[in-house]
Amino acid sequence: MSGSYAGAPGTGAESSARFTGEESTGPAGKPGTGSAEEAGGRRRRRSCRALPAGRPVGLFCGLTVVDVIQLVEAPPGPDDKVVALDQLVAAGGPATNAAVAFAALGGRAILAAPVGAGPLAELVRADLAATGVELIDCSGGPGGSDRSVLDLGAPSAGAPEIRGEDAPAAGAGLPAAGAPVPVVPEAPGLSVSSCVITAATGQRSVVSTNARAVAVTAPLDRYVARVDRGRRPPPDVVLIDGHNPALAEVSLDLAARAGALTVMDAGSWKDAAARLPGRCDVVAASARFYPPGPTGSVTAPRDVAHWLLDAGARGVVITRGARPALWWCAGGHDSVAPPQVAAVDTLGAGDVFHGALAHALAGTRRDDLTGPALGAAVERACDVAAASTEVFGTRAWRQRLD
């Protein structure tokens, strides 16, 4: 789910908006109480430029949808119509937007998600190719397989090209000349999210069917086999978003063999994904992540962090709107105040946060996940996520990386 954003100009909450975080910390490595601003609320100069280090490989597994985004002066009321100020249609979803952010920061992003065939699926493929994200379609619908779109025909502009023995033959996967093009229905799992952005505040409203029940019949078998045989580089970091749990389990198994750090975007609690937080090195939870407790749902951020650490996570990050992001690990705890920005559009800011967090942690060994390493990664993610809210849409912010 896209990250939330509060305190944007015009809301009355704060005169200048800041992205992510809340709450406070206590003894080293454990949550506590008090003022988050006192713990880590100092103002910082933002830095969101793409770093020049070696190009890390990130595998992102989860949900892909089509985002239809409209910028309006005010949302329509009942039985009302309004004229949008701007619009964008793009691939969306937590893992998808995180992969786009990872690629924008200089990483090689591989997205594994069910997409299938049809006009909406082709729109998704074109958008991902333009952003430099490699798609592995794991859909069980028409056209679905675990073959990368880069294995089919010539690579699209902007996407990494496969060379050597993995390169496809010329015209591979394309219909013969003059052959009829079959008309196929949409894959059952591909959803559309209708997103309305209020121009004065940057706040968003979203309506979506989210992930639908779809059989993932090709759970990365081809990709995993190539990595295991050394024909493709192993991922440096793996991010899952809790959608399509079976696919997430396969990716986490691969990460364990490859020694890759694992990150979970825990936007909200999902019963079907209950096993996943304990298998991940870092769990980035939103304020709406409420795991089950002995007497009901666990809701307080410090209690959520306790729950995740006890479940097996090595590091925990909790974000809540415009207040400082909180993190905990065995090496300590702290909070990070994001830079102040004038928010234009908050849609997908949480997803960008997770993609930037994965990029900052890529290549970090599990045993090296110390407080300073996690804290620096959270600070970096706050900077990039805040920058993403300063322009309309989920793509234009990439041009502002300085």
What is each stretch, according to the model?
Residues 1-57, 83, 298-402:
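Conserved phosphate-binding/catalytic region of the ribokinase-like
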Residues 162-166, 184-188, 193-237, 242:
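Conserved phosphate-binding/catalytic loop of the ribokinase/pfkB sugar-kinase fold
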Residues 1-21, 25-26, 34-133, 145-148, ...:
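Glycine-rich phosphate/adenosyl-contacting loop at the front of the ribokinase-like
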Residues 41-44, 213-216, 262-268, 367-368:
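Short gly/ser/thr-rich secondary-structure transition/capping motifs
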Residues 57-59, 236-237, 282:
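Structural motif
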Residues 249-335:
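Conserved phosphate/ATP/ADP-binding segment of small-molecule kinases
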